[in-house]
Each structure stands twice: as C-alpha cells, then as structure tokens.
C-alpha cells in the first residue's frame, strides 16, 4: 500500500521515518523540535513530528501509539490514549504526550517518542431500529459481565 509522506522539517533528513525491522508493524515518529522539551509529572504537551501523510484511501487510517518502552519504563504515554489520523487529513502529525510518572521526562530533538501504524477501516452503514434483528447471548451485559 502506498502512503505519501511529506517531510515538513528538513532536520528529519538525518533520521528519516521508517520501519526498524522487516516485522515492524509501525514506524517510529521523532520529536521534531529545536531543543529539549521537559514534561513535568502530570503535564501534557503537543509535540511536532515534522511530517504529514496522505493516506488518500477511505479504507485505511493511521493510528499514533505510544512506544512501549517509554510508556513502561519512563511513564511517557499519549495524552489522548490513541491518536487517530483520518485518510483525508494532510496536516502535520502532532502527538499529545503525557507524563504519568513522578519524574520529569526529557524529550530530546529527533528522539523516537511515538509510533505510527496504518490500519484497515470499515465504514458501517447504520440503520436506526427499535429492536435488534437478533439477540446475542451476551445481550446488554458489560463491565465485567463475562468475568474480571
């Protein structure tokens, strides 16, 4: 699948986004900043990536996810949980970063701080109904209904 990637900040030429291994599901996003940003405990900031993408296919979207090591070891996660990039969005990718740790976290220029994965999307045709055509076994059970 072809996705156009536009480099908005020439500093990224030094460290182009790409897949780390043949089996990588996502590309690492780099902090496209001129100087380090310090996130205090409980603080949330938008970090520029210096790139824009053009998926141009409504059957796909992109998701921005935290890097597992940074989330687990440092407490750096996404402020919005997951970033969803629609297929028709063409602006710069910005990442909401949240520090859930007790320590200040430094985000350095060109640091790999998040990741981007392309995922398939199905757009549903919703039909307004009074009752569902079939009752599932689960029905309305939720929030621990099948066990905790």
Curated annotation (Swiss-Prot):
It catalyses: dUTP + H2O = dUMP + diphosphate + H(+). GO terms for biological process: dUMP biosynthetic process; dUTP catabolic process. Transmembrane segments: none annotated. It holds the Pfam family dUTPase. Its EC number is 3.6.1.23. Substrate binds at residues 67-69, 80, 84-86, 94. Keywords: Hydrolase, Magnesium, Metal-binding, Nucleotide metabolism. Its cofactor is Mg(2+). One of its GO terms (molecular function) is dUTP diphosphatase activity. InterPro entries: dUTPase, dUTPase-like, dUTPase-like_sf, dUTPase_trimeric. Pathway: Pyrimidine metabolism; dUMP biosynthesis; dUMP from dCTP (dUTP route): step 2/2. This enzyme is involved in nucleotide metabolism: it produces dUMP, the immediate precursor of thymidine nucleotides and it decreases the intracellular concentration of dUTP so that uracil cannot be incorporated into DNA. HAMAP family: dUTPase_bact. Belongs to the dUTPase family. This is Deoxyuridine 5'-triphosphate nucleotidohydrolase. It comes from Francisella tularensis subsp. holarctica (strain LVS). The gene is dut.
